[in-house]
Amino acid sequence: MAQKVEAGGGAGGASWDDGVHDGVRKVHVGQGQDGVSSINVVYAKDSQDVEGGEHGKKTLLGFETFEVDADDYIVAVQVTYDNVFGQDSDIITSITFNTFKGKTSPPYGLETQKKFVLKDKNGGKLVGFHGRAGEALYALGAYFATTTTPVTPAKKLSAIGGDEGTAWDDGAYDGVKKVYVGQGQDGISAVKFEYNKGAENIVGGEHGKPTLLGFEEFEIDYPSEYITAVEGTYDKIFGSDGLIITMLRFKTNKQTSAPFGLEAGTAFELKEEGHKIVGFHGKASELLHQFGVHVMPLTN
């Protein structure tokens, strides 16, 4: 059920309403001499792109476009408005978009003193716009829907190591419970992880090829304990075309694991300040070639 947030701005022009969609893909903001001349929004509806249509008047200054990533959504729109010469009503002078993942657009138009913010008190996602338009964009309002995505999205940090092997990705979970590292003669032959998602234990697949040396385990006292960083090394070894991960060491908010594998080659660290590690990805063949993580902000 979408919530309608009333339009702010002036009373000029005629009212328009794009209605409610699944989300916003792109916003084209028409530039005017004194502010925003028009708006045209591309929405997502049943995985199709739907154009809302142009509201306002196109000028020779053209459009500026704000694109929303597929795994992101708009949570707030900061709007300024003012009375400009030649208009009998306030017009929208600038629009700035804020997304869930922390992306902020530049202000489109010219920022002025009077302002309002379109947002949902429950942090919902923007799924439609409405307002008033004519010779310019006079007023802007929005629809917000409660979102089913978790309150904090996970972020994928790039994997480090060699380019050989097949890519694998366990995705992101609520947390990590257990780490299994397969020992190889010259480094790490395989990895496997046990995750937690909504009080359910999920064991990810085996990535790489286990050897007779078996797996070593590192257990995390989830949920009070969580992984904050992974240190490791990678190197070129005899008989292998590319780089392989030779050692991994896991750091939590309470302890540091023993090094798994053989510390040799170039050192690396995977971490993001103020985040915990909630998933892993990489590349593997008969050995582990590349290793990366998914992180999520720490919540109090």
Swiss-Prot record:
One of its GO terms (cellular component) is nucleus. Residues 1-20 are annotated as: Disordered. It holds the Pfam family Jacalin. One of its GO terms (molecular function) is carbohydrate binding. GO terms for biological process: response to zinc ion. Keywords: Acetylation, Lectin, Repeat. Gene3D superfamilies: Jacalin-like lectin domain. CDD domains: Jacalin (cd09612). The keyword Cell inner membrane does not apply. InterPro entries: Jacalin-like_lectin_dom, Jacalin-like_lectin_dom_plant, Jacalin-like_lectin_dom_sf. Residues 2-146, 154-297 form the Jacalin-type lectin domain. The modification N-acetylalanine is found at A2. PANTHER family: JACALIN-RELATED LECTIN 3 (PTHR47293), JACALIN-RELATED LECTIN 32-RELATED (PTHR47293:SF12). Belongs to the jacalin lectin family. Component of the PYK10 complex, at least composed of PYK10/BGLU23, BGLU21, BGLU22, JAL22, JAL23, PBP1/JAL30, PBP2/JAL31, JAL32, JAL33, JAL34, JAL35, GLL22 and GLL23. Sugar-binding protein showing significant affinity for (Glc alpha(1-4)Glc)(3) maltohexaose, (Glc alpha(1-6)Glc)(3) isomaltohexaose, Gal alpha(1-4)Gal beta(1-4)Glc, GalNAc alpha(1-3)(Fuc alpha(1-2)) and Gal beta(1-3)(Fuc alpha(1-4))GlcNAc beta(1-3)Gal beta(1-4)Glc. This is Jacalin-related lectin 33.
